[in-house]
Design a protein with these regions (language model features):
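A solvent-exposed interaction/effector surface
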Residues: 1-114
Length: 114
């Protein structure tokens, strides 16, 4: 999936600085350091429990329309992002057919009320 930086979400280029991420399977934490500083050093981030604004959509992670719709929804409902947004790809090119030539994704952003 794609990780979209919180600092860029309300900008003219909400995908600026975006990068990729991977979801590790249950049990992988046993192979990783337990110290948060060590995890950060190797680029591992654990998504916290909390309230997330989620929006499923057809589209590509490098197209800004999806995150712009999420940002508009956050603004409309007085929500503030408290972390990076994550665009999870559920169905990719392996699921393309005549009606859909795009990925099916879910953008998730940790939020709080303003």
């Amino acid at each position: 999936g794609a990780m979209l930086r919180r600092e860029a979400l309300h900008s003219d280029d909400p995908i600026a600085g975006a990068g990729s991420f991977a979801v590790l399977p249950r049990g992988a934490e046993e192979l990783l350091p337990s110290d948060p500083a060590e995890l950060a050093e190797i680029g591992v981030e654990v998504l916290p429990e909390g309230t997330y604004l989620c929006m499923s959509r057809w589209g590509m992670p490098y197209e800004p329309e999806g995150i712009r719709a999420v940002v508009a929804c956050m603004d409309k409902h007085a929500l503030q992002p408290i972390g990076n947004a994550f665009d999870f790809c559920y169905l990719d090119t392996t699921s393309y057919d005549e009606s859909h030539q795009e990925d099916f994704c879910c953008i998730q952003v940790p939020v709080v009320l303003k």
